[in-house]
Every structure is written in structure tokens, then in C-alpha cells.
Design a protein with these regions (language model features):
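Eukaryotic phosphotyrosine signaling hubs
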Residues: 1-107, 111-114, 129, 153, ...
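Contiguous beta-strand segments within globular domains
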Residues: 121-123, 127-167, 234
Length: 552
């Protein structure tokens, strides 16, 4: 009877252990699903939005929420791992080997440990990306964070993080083999090691590299039409730490977004083309750093719109985007509305092939316009005072029916980063002023130049120029004090020969004490109708002369 009772208890225990193993198995299945949702959906989405931020997209980071989910997962996984290990220990202690149980527990232990490993390695992330266009010998910053560091007590022995720069081919090899040759790198980075610190208030384990500097870069061999600005690198962040009193050791690494390395400022526009194309069209889970060679115009338009809005403060209109499509596809105005939407734009058309009869590409033209607007025209652009994206012929057609003195502003087709003023003269004739560039606006702003030119009366269609640009005029005081060194400061005023004297010479304007008719030929200078640079622009302020006014 005693033996029978013992056998019944043993059978009951075996059944309970089988039930426990089944429940643990179900728990791991649920954890797997949940972890996949957090890592493969939420964290991947966060990374994608972080990449689009590089193109100017608004980034509402929910990383703190993702950390909370990851910490909860880490806690549940760790507790279940302890349960499995305890069940294994009891099995060995009792010495019972019921059929079917002996193999389940080690297998479950492997599964739960793999889940933990995946969670830890996936949550070692770059919170603040390094600059994607990186100039050698220029300081830059970056921050990495371990989302589950606090929960797993990793900070008890703070891990070291090392940063190296690797090529596209090396990044490929790393993802395939999960390892790289020791010490292999594509350049030298100063101040490239740091210790992760735990911040009690935020419960974040992170390290900020504030003073890194790329000293040297090794380039790959170029093929065909490739340039150094097409070549992509990545910063590799590596660390190692243990959890559970050294029971588990994790080697973690993560790659930054693609980086283009330049040595000179004139390489910046093309480098940004590479980065913009990659950020916009990179697909999840791609081979580093593969991007499509052709993309639908609608996607390109979205990327350009996002970029322009971030730089200048205002989105492009449908008309603006149609103009850009026409320019990118070298359409010359023949295409009808909407024809471009399904067309595919190639990387070569985007930033390799020069525009017709020009020595610059579509991207170089767009980038120069965006830079000019950001640095010198932001206010009027946001107000809608700059039409900008309109062809010379269209501008002439619009103005041909307007009154004398009506003007509009358009970006030059022929000069990089140039904006020209088109206006109506006598007998409805339309004139174009030679384009102003950043160099001109560094001397005198657009609004002040428009104020100087008395023959400009109303912004198209009929907005008085004071209403459109008045708030951007530089305040003027008649009695200018002498500077600290005793000199009287001169004032530079824009004047178009043949179109009236400088402001004030007609009895009004912003600068009433400007001398009368210092330089006034009898007829308009024929070069004002051109929209091309001239030799004169190298020695004078565009085609307009600058009248120096001494305020005495």
C-alpha cells in the first residue's frame, strides 16, 4: 500500500512537471511574439523615423516608452529563465527521468536564453547619430544607449564602448559573419572610447562621445563614374558586458546610419545627395548600404519637399514640384500636369548628369537654391513673397499683362544659388536683373535691395513692396554715429544704371540723405535683361552698381 501510494505521488509529480514544462513553453511562445512586436515593429519603426529625420522629417521619439517595454520584457524573461533552471535543478536532485521531460527543459533553457540574448543585442542602439556628412579633422558627437542596462544591473560593472569607422564592404562582412578581423578599420578616430554611465533620474545607461574626430580615411577603389562622395562608411560601436554575476557574457555592436566622408567644403553638395537618397529610399533589412538606382518621382518629390521644408520653414507647392520634375527629367515644359508622377528618376539624372547646357546637375541646382533660401531668404519665402520656382519664359508671360513696376522673384536657371528680379518696365517690356547670390546678400539683404530700387513698385500680382518686404528692411537712422575707431561708416545702396537714382534721389525711399544722381546713364544697361553671370559680377555688385553713401 505504501509503495502504491508513493508510485501515485511520483506519477502526480511527473504530471505536474509535464504541466509546468508545457506552461513554460506557452510562456516562451507568448514572450517571443511580444518581443518580436517590440523589437521588429516598434524599435525598427523608431530607427526608420530616426533615419528620415536626417532628411528633415519631424521625429517624435518614443524611445523612453520602448525602453520601458524592453525592461519589462527583460525582467519577465529573466524570471522565467530562473524558473526553468530551478526545475532542472530539482529534476537532477530527485533523480526522476519521466519520459518526455528530460529533453524539454534544456531546450526551453536554450530558447529563453536566446530570447534574452536577442533582446540585449537589439537594444544596444545609437540614440544620437553621428553626422552623416563627416569632414575629416572636424569634431563630432554621438550617443549610444543600452535600453535594458538598468534592469539587468549591467551598470554595476560599467561597460566600455569603442568606436571605429568601417567601409560598406566591411559592414557587409560583419552582418554575414557576425565578426570582423581584429583591429580592422577604414580610418582613425580620435577619442573613440567611452564608459557607459547609469543616470539614476532617467534610468538610462548610455555614453556620449563629445569630442570624436576622424583623422584619416582609407578609400575603396573607385569604379566607373563613382566619386569619393558616392562612397558610404559606417561607425561601428562595440562593447562587452556580463549579467547574472558573469553567468552570461554579451558581445554587442551596432552600426550608425551611412556616413559620407569629405575633406573639403566643395564636396558637401554631392555628399548630401548620397545621404539624402540613402535616407529616403533605404529598405528595411537591406544589404549595407544598397539603394535602388531608380525611384518613382512621387517618392523623390516627397524627399525633396521634406528636405526643403526643414531647411527653409515652408513646404513646396504642387506647382513648385511640377517645376522640379520638369527640370529633373529635362522636360523643357512639354509634359502635361501629372505626367511625371509615375515616371522613374535615376540616380544619374538626380546628381550625376549635368542639366542641358549647364555645368551642374539637378541636385547641385536644388541644393544651392535651398542653401540660399535658408541663409538669406527664409522670411520672405515663408511669407510667400518669393515665387522662386518658375521658368524665365513663364515669368515674362505672367508679367506681360501687369502694370509698370510690378515685379517677382525667381530662382536663376543659369547661376547656382541665384535669385533674380523680373519686373515690368515701360510699354509692358519685362526685364530681368542679373541674379543675386549669397555673396551679394552678405553685403546687403534682399529686402534692402528691393527698397533701394525705386522702379520696383508692387510684388506680383499687386502687393505694395513695403507691405511685402517692409518688415525686413534694415532700420535706418539719419545721423549715423562714428565707429569706435573714429571713422564714418559708409552705406552701400543698390542702383541699376538707367533706372533712376538710388533710393532717396527721387525725393523718397528709405535713405533720404543719399546724394542725387551720382551715376545715371540715359538708357537702361542692356545686360539687365540677361539671366546669366557676366564678367562684371566679379568686380561689381551683380549688374547693379553699388553707390557708396557717406552719412556725414
Amino acid at each position: 500500500m505504501l509503495e502504491q501510494m508513493l508510485n501515485q505521488k511520483v506519477a502526480g509529480l511527473v504530471q505536474l512537471r509535464l504541466t509546468l514544462a508545457d506552461k513554460l513553453k506557452d510562456t516562451i511562445t507568448h514572450l517571443n511574439t511580444l518581443q518580436s512586436r517590440v523589437l521588429d515593429d516598434e524599435l525598427i519603426r523608431w530607427k526608420r523615423e530616426q533615419q528620415l529625420q536626417g532628411n528633415g522629417s519631424q521625429f517624435n521619439s518614443n524611445l523612453d516608452s520602448i525602453q520601458e517595454w524592453c525592461e519589462s520584457l527583460a525582467e519577465i524573461i529573466w524570471l522565467n529563465r530562473q524558473q526553468i533552471k530551478e526545475a532542472e535543478r530539482l529534476k537532477q536532485k530527485v533523480g526522476l527521468e519521466p519520459p518526455g521531460v528530460a529533453d524539454i527543459l534544456p531546450n526551453l533553457n536554450n530558447q529563453i536564453t536566446q530570447l534574452l540574448s536577442s533582446l540585449v543585442t537589439s537594444t544596444f542602439i545609437i540614440e544620437k547619430q553621428p553626422p552623416q556628412v563627416m569632414k575629416t579633422n572636424t569634431r563630432f558627437t554621438s550617443t549610444v544607449r543600452l535600453l535594458v542596462g538598468g534592469k539587468l544591473n549591467v551598470h554595476m560593472t560599467p561597460p566600455q564602448v569603442k568606436v571605429t569607422i568601417i567601409s560598406e564592404a566591411q559592414a557587409n562582412a560583419l552582418l554575414k559573419n557576425d565578426k570582423m578581423a581584429k583591429g580592422e578599420a577604414s580610418g582613425d578616430i580620435l577619442n573613440n572610447t567611452g564608459t557607459m554611465e547609469y543616470h539614476q533620474a532617467t534610468r538610462q545607461l548610455s555614453v556620449s562621445f563629445r569630442n570624436m574626430q576622424l583623422k584619416k580615411i582609407k578609400r575603396a577603389e573607385k569604379k566607373g563614374t563613382e566619386s569619393v562622395m558616392d562612397e558610404k562608411f559606417s561607425l561601428l560601436f562595440q562593447s562587452q558586458f556580463s549579467v547574472g554575476g558573469g553567468e552570461l557574457v554579451f558581445q554587442v555592436w551596432t552600426l550608425s546610419l551611412p556616413v559620407v566622408v569629405i575633406v573639403h567644403g566643395n564636396q558637401e553638395p554631392h555628399a548630401w545627395a548620397t545621404v539624402t537618397w540613402d535616407n529616403a529610399f533605404a529598405e528595411p533589412g537591406r544589404i549595407p548600404f544598397a539603394v535602388p538606382d531608380k525611384v518613382a518621382w512621387l517618392q523623390v518629390a516627397d524627399a525633396l519637399n521634406m528636405k526643403f521644408k526643414a531647411a527653409t520653414g515652408r513646404l513646396l507647392t504642387e506647382e513648385n514640384l511640377r517645376f522640379l520634375a520638369e527640370k529633373a527629367f529635362r522636360g523643357g515644359g512639354q509634359q502635361q500636369v501629372g505626367d511625371y508622377s509615375t515616371m522613374m528618376l535615376s540616380w544619374s539624372q538626380f546628381c550625376k548628369e549635368p542639366l542641358p547646357e549647364r555645368n551642374f546637375t539637378f541636385w547641385e541646382w536644388f541644393y544651392a537654391v535651398m542653401k540660399l533660401t535658408r541663409e538669406h531668404l527664409r522670411g520672405p519665402w515663408i511669407d510667400g513673397a518669393i515665387m522662386g520656382f518658375i521658368r524665365k519664359k513663364q515669368a515674362e508671360e505672367l508679367l506681360s499683362t501687369c502694370a509698370n513696376g510690378v515685379f517677382l522673384l525667381r530662382f536663376s536657371d543659369s547661376e547656382l544659388g541665384g535669385v533674380t528680379i523680373a519686373w515690368v518696365g515701360e510699354q509692358a517690356e519685362v526685364f530681368m536683373l542679373q541674379p543675386f547670390t549669397s555673396k551679394d546678400f552678405a553685403i546687403r539683404s534682399l529686402a534692402d535691395r528691393i527698397s533701394d530700387l525705386q522702379h520696383l513698385v508692387s510684388l506680383f500680382p499687386d502687393v505694395p513692396k513695403e507691405q511685402a518686404f517692409g518688415k525686413y528692411y534694415t532700420p535706418y537712422t539719419e545721423n549715423q554715429p562714428t565707429t569706435s575707431n573714429g571713422y564714418v561708416k559708409p552705406l552701400l545702396v543698390t542702383h541699376v544704371p538707367g533706372w533712376g537714382g538710388p533710393a532717396g534721389s527721387l525725393g523718397g525711399g528709405s535713405y533720404p540723405s543719399t546724394p542725387q544722381n551720382m551715376y545715371q546713364p540715359q538708357s537702361p544697361d542692356p545686360s539687365v535683361t540677361r539671366d546669366t553671370p557676366s564678367v562684371a559680377s566679379a568686380v561689381s555688385d551683380s549688374v547693379s552698381s553699388l553707390t557708396t553713401v557717406m552719412e556725414l
